[in-house]
C-alpha cells in the first residue's frame, strides 16, 4: 500500500512538473506580422510555448471573438474594431501590474487610443502602418510609361488599371480597407455614414473589378517579390517585406511603395486578451515581452512596420527607422486618415457592397 501510494505521489508530481513545463500561450496574429526569432526567443527565455495561428482580415478575427469561444490568449485587432469588441465583452481588462514595460509606450499615442479604449484598459498598441500601393517599378514603367505611382488613379481608373492588368493587379480582401480608400479617392469622407457615398464607391469599384486579378490580404507579398503581379493595393510593411524578398532573390526585381497624393489609411494594431483566455498569466508575459525595446525593434526591422515604443528607435536598423515608407514624414502623415468605428448598418452595407464587387455582379 505504501509502495502504491508512493508511486501515486510520484506520478502526480511528475504530471505537475510536466504541466508546468507545458505552459502555453495561444496567439492569433496577422500573417507575416512577427519577428523572425520572436516566438523562439520568448519560449527559450520563459519556458512558455507559443501556439501561433494567423488570419488576414479584421472580419475573420471579429467572427471568432464575437462567437464567444475564440480559443486564444492574445489577439491582434485593429484599433477601430476594438471599441465595439470591448462593448461586446470580447476582452478582459489588462492587469498592468503584470506589464512592467508599459512605460516604454508613447504617451501621446496612448492618449489618442483612449477614444476607443478609455484608460487603455483593454488594448496595448503593437505596430502601426499605412495603406498604399506596392508596385514593380520596371513592369509599371513598361505598362504606363511612368517612373513611379503617385495616385490612386493608377488602380481606381479603368483606363489605367486596364493597362496594368496584363502584369497583374491585386487588391486587399477587405471591405474595411478598400471601400474607405475609394471614398477618399472620390473626395468623400472615408468614414462616411451616408449610404449614397457607399453606392458611389461601389459603382467605381465595379468599373475596375474586371481588371483585378485577385483579392487577398497577404498573398500579394510573395507575388510581388516573385514578379507574379506588378501592383498591389496593400499594407506598407507587407510591401516592405516583398521588396526585401525580391532583393534577397537577386533577380533584378525592384519593388516600391507609394502613399498616393490623395492620402491613405493610417492604422494601429493592438494586443488584447480575449475574455475566454485560459492562460492569462502567460498572455501578460507575452505582451510584456513585446513591450521590451529590443524585442519590438527586432520585430519592426523584420516586418517593416513602425512601433509605438519610445526606446526602440535607437535599437532598430536605421535604414528601416529612417525609411519614409515605414515612418512617414509629417507632410505625408498630414494627408492620412484614421478609420473610425462605423454604425452597424453602415458596416453591413460595406459588407454587402464588397461581396458584390468581389463577385463582379
Model-derived regions, located:
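Extracytoplasmic ligand-binding site segments that recognize negatively charged/polar headgroups
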Residues: 76, 82, 86-211, 221-225
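Conserved C-terminal helix/tail region of periplasmic/extracytoplasmic solute-binding proteins
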Residues: 222, 330-361
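Gram-negative bacterial Sec-dependent N-terminal signal peptides
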Residues: 1-21
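Early extracytoplasmic/lumenal segment of secretory-pathway proteins
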Residues: 22-85
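A ligand-binding cleft/hinge motif common to bilobed small-molecule-binding domains
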Residues: 81-84, 231-252
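Periplasmic-binding protein-like
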Residues: 198-207, 213, 251-272
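Mature extracytoplasmic/periplasmic domains
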Residues: 269, 274-335
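Short beta-strand->loop
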Residues: 92-103, 153, 249-265, 274-276
